[in-house]
Amino acid sequence: MQMVINEMKQKAIYPGTFDPVTNGHIDIITRASTIFPELIVAVASNKNKRPYLSWESRISLLEESVGHLTGVRVVGFDNLLIDFVLEQNAGIILRGLRAVSDFEYEFQLAGMNRKLSKKVETLFLTPAEHLMYISSTLVREIAALNGDISQFVPPNVVRELKKRQNERSL
Protein backbone atom coordinates (compact mmCIF):
# COMPACT_ATOMS: atom_id res chain seq x y z
CA MET A 1 0.00 0.00 0.00
CA GLN A 2 2.80 2.43 0.89
CA MET A 3 4.39 1.93 -2.55
CA VAL A 4 1.11 2.81 -4.31
CA ILE A 5 0.78 5.99 -2.25
CA ASN A 6 4.37 6.97 -3.07
CA GLU A 7 3.75 6.39 -6.79
CA MET A 8 0.66 8.61 -6.60
CA LYS A 9 2.69 11.36 -4.94
CA GLN A 10 5.08 11.37 -7.91
CA LYS A 11 2.32 12.69 -10.19
CA ALA A 12 0.80 16.14 -9.73
CA ILE A 13 -2.19 17.82 -11.35
CA TYR A 14 -2.10 21.58 -11.96
CA PRO A 15 -5.72 22.49 -12.76
CA GLY A 16 -7.13 25.74 -14.08
CA THR A 17 -9.20 27.37 -16.77
CA PHE A 18 -6.12 29.11 -18.24
CA ASP A 19 -8.29 31.65 -20.06
CA PRO A 20 -5.69 32.61 -21.23
CA VAL A 21 -2.53 31.02 -19.91
CA THR A 22 -0.22 33.67 -18.43
CA ASN A 23 3.49 33.88 -17.73
CA GLY A 24 2.59 33.30 -14.06
CA HIS A 25 1.05 29.94 -15.00
CA ILE A 26 4.09 29.10 -17.14
CA ASP A 27 6.41 29.95 -14.24
CA ILE A 28 4.56 27.58 -11.90
CA ILE A 29 4.43 24.81 -14.54
CA THR A 30 8.15 25.18 -15.28
CA ARG A 31 9.15 25.07 -11.63
CA ALA A 32 6.75 22.21 -10.83
CA SER A 33 8.21 20.19 -13.70
CA THR A 34 11.51 20.15 -11.80
CA ILE A 35 9.80 18.90 -8.63
CA PHE A 36 7.46 16.21 -9.96
CA PRO A 37 8.49 13.48 -12.43
CA GLU A 38 5.04 13.80 -14.01
CA LEU A 39 2.92 16.94 -14.14
CA ILE A 40 -0.49 17.04 -15.77
CA VAL A 41 -1.73 20.52 -16.61
CA ALA A 42 -5.50 20.01 -16.44
CA VAL A 43 -7.58 22.49 -18.42
CA ALA A 44 -11.11 22.75 -17.01
CA SER A 45 -13.95 23.12 -19.48
CA ASN A 46 -15.77 25.11 -16.77
CA LYS A 47 -19.29 25.13 -18.18
CA ASN A 48 -20.41 27.53 -15.43
CA LYS A 49 -18.21 30.32 -16.81
CA ARG A 50 -18.33 31.83 -20.27
CA PRO A 51 -14.72 31.42 -21.35
CA TYR A 52 -13.11 33.98 -23.63
CA LEU A 53 -11.16 31.27 -25.46
CA SER A 54 -12.56 27.88 -26.43
CA TRP A 55 -11.55 24.83 -24.43
CA GLU A 56 -9.68 23.46 -27.45
CA SER A 57 -7.85 26.78 -27.92
CA ARG A 58 -6.78 26.91 -24.27
CA ILE A 59 -5.46 23.33 -24.46
CA SER A 60 -3.61 24.03 -27.71
CA LEU A 61 -2.03 27.28 -26.44
CA LEU A 62 -0.81 25.50 -23.31
CA GLU A 63 0.59 22.58 -25.30
CA GLU A 64 2.55 25.03 -27.46
CA SER A 65 3.77 26.93 -24.40
CA VAL A 66 4.98 23.98 -22.32
CA GLY A 67 5.67 21.31 -24.95
CA HIS A 68 9.43 21.62 -24.41
CA LEU A 69 9.19 20.65 -20.72
CA THR A 70 10.02 17.05 -19.78
CA GLY A 71 7.30 15.12 -17.96
CA VAL A 72 4.56 17.71 -18.61
CA ARG A 73 1.29 16.79 -20.29
CA VAL A 74 -1.71 19.01 -21.04
CA VAL A 75 -5.13 17.38 -20.69
CA GLY A 76 -8.67 18.73 -20.75
CA PHE A 77 -11.20 17.64 -18.14
CA ASP A 78 -14.88 18.29 -17.59
CA ASN A 79 -15.69 16.40 -14.41
CA LEU A 80 -15.14 16.96 -10.70
CA LEU A 81 -11.47 17.79 -10.10
CA ILE A 82 -10.98 15.17 -7.38
CA ASP A 83 -12.45 12.48 -9.66
CA PHE A 84 -10.11 13.55 -12.46
CA VAL A 85 -7.11 13.45 -10.10
CA LEU A 86 -7.99 9.92 -8.97
CA GLU A 87 -8.63 8.78 -12.58
CA GLN A 88 -5.12 9.96 -13.43
CA ASN A 89 -3.73 8.04 -10.42
CA ALA A 90 -2.23 11.26 -9.07
CA GLY A 91 -1.78 12.16 -5.42
CA ILE A 92 -1.10 15.89 -5.59
CA ILE A 93 -3.20 18.87 -6.64
CA LEU A 94 -0.93 21.82 -7.30
CA ARG A 95 -2.42 25.31 -6.97
CA GLY A 96 -0.91 28.72 -7.49
CA LEU A 97 -1.22 31.51 -4.94
CA ARG A 98 -0.62 35.07 -6.11
CA ALA A 99 -1.75 37.02 -3.08
CA VAL A 100 -3.29 36.64 0.35
CA SER A 101 -6.67 37.25 -1.30
CA ASP A 102 -6.30 33.91 -3.17
CA PHE A 103 -5.60 32.01 0.03
CA GLU A 104 -9.09 31.90 1.56
CA TYR A 105 -10.72 30.41 -1.55
CA GLU A 106 -7.82 27.99 -2.12
CA PHE A 107 -7.88 26.94 1.55
CA GLN A 108 -11.61 26.10 1.28
CA LEU A 109 -11.06 24.24 -1.98
CA ALA A 110 -8.20 22.22 -0.49
CA GLY A 111 -10.33 21.33 2.53
CA MET A 112 -13.23 20.22 0.36
CA ASN A 113 -10.96 18.09 -1.83
CA ARG A 114 -9.44 16.55 1.31
CA LYS A 115 -12.96 15.63 2.51
CA LEU A 116 -13.71 14.03 -0.87
CA SER A 117 -10.50 11.96 -0.87
CA LYS A 118 -7.89 11.38 1.80
CA LYS A 119 -5.55 10.02 -0.92
CA VAL A 120 -4.94 13.46 -2.42
CA GLU A 121 -2.94 16.37 -0.99
CA THR A 122 -3.02 19.99 -2.15
CA LEU A 123 0.26 21.89 -2.45
CA PHE A 124 0.67 25.58 -3.17
CA LEU A 125 3.32 27.40 -5.18
CA THR A 126 3.65 31.13 -5.64
CA PRO A 127 4.80 32.54 -8.96
CA ALA A 128 8.01 34.52 -9.21
CA GLU A 129 7.68 37.90 -7.51
CA HIS A 130 7.57 39.88 -10.77
CA LEU A 131 4.62 37.75 -11.98
CA MET A 132 2.42 37.81 -8.87
CA TYR A 133 0.09 40.55 -10.07
CA ILE A 134 -0.75 38.90 -13.42
CA SER A 135 -4.17 37.31 -13.80
CA SER A 136 -6.03 35.97 -16.82
CA THR A 137 -8.86 38.42 -16.09
CA LEU A 138 -6.53 41.44 -16.21
CA VAL A 139 -4.89 40.14 -19.39
CA ARG A 140 -8.29 39.81 -21.08
CA GLU A 141 -9.24 43.35 -20.00
CA ILE A 142 -5.99 44.84 -21.31
CA ALA A 143 -6.32 42.91 -24.59
CA ALA A 144 -9.94 44.04 -25.02
CA LEU A 145 -8.74 47.65 -24.87
CA ASN A 146 -5.94 46.94 -27.39
CA GLY A 147 -3.24 47.20 -24.72
CA ASP A 148 0.13 45.50 -24.96
CA ILE A 149 -0.06 42.11 -23.21
CA SER A 150 3.28 40.77 -24.47
CA GLN A 151 4.97 41.02 -21.07
CA PHE A 152 2.19 39.02 -19.38
CA VAL A 153 1.61 36.02 -21.68
CA PRO A 154 3.58 33.74 -24.02
CA PRO A 155 3.97 34.94 -27.65
CA ASN A 156 1.47 32.39 -29.02
CA VAL A 157 -1.18 33.79 -26.66
CA VAL A 158 -0.45 37.36 -27.82
CA ARG A 159 -1.04 36.24 -31.43
CA GLU A 160 -4.25 34.38 -30.55
CA LEU A 161 -5.74 37.27 -28.58
CA LYS A 162 -4.85 39.78 -31.33
CA LYS A 163 -6.51 37.49 -33.85
CA ARG A 164 -9.65 37.33 -31.71
CA GLN A 165 -9.69 41.12 -31.30
CA ASN A 166 -9.41 41.56 -35.07
CA GLU A 167 -12.26 39.10 -35.67
CA ARG A 168 -14.46 40.94 -33.17
CA SER A 169 -13.78 44.32 -34.76
CA LEU A 170 -14.89 43.16 -38.23
Swiss-Prot record:
ATP binds at T17, F18, H25, G96, L97, R98, E106, L131, M132, Y133, I134, S135, S136, T137. The keyword Transferase applies. Its main location: cytoplasm. GO terms for molecular function: ATP binding; pantetheine-phosphate adenylyltransferase activity. One of its GO terms (cellular component) is cytoplasm. Pfam families: CTP_transf_like (PF01467). Its cofactor is Mg(2+). It comes from the Bacteria. InterPro entries: Cyt_trans-like, PPAT, Rossmann-like_a/b/a_fold. Its EC number is 2.7.7.3. It is found in: Cytoplasm. It catalyses: (R)-4'-phosphopantetheine + ATP + H(+) = 3'-dephospho-CoA + diphosphate. One of its GO terms (biological process) is coenzyme A biosynthetic process. Pathway: Cofactor biosynthesis; coenzyme A biosynthesis; CoA from (R)-pantothenate: step 4/5. Homohexamer. Reversibly transfers an adenylyl group from ATP to 4'-phosphopantetheine, yielding dephospho-CoA (dPCoA) and pyrophosphate. Belongs to the bacterial CoaD family. This is Phosphopantetheine adenylyltransferase. The lineage of its organism: Bacteria, Pseudomonadati, Pseudomonadota, Gammaproteobacteria, Legionellales.
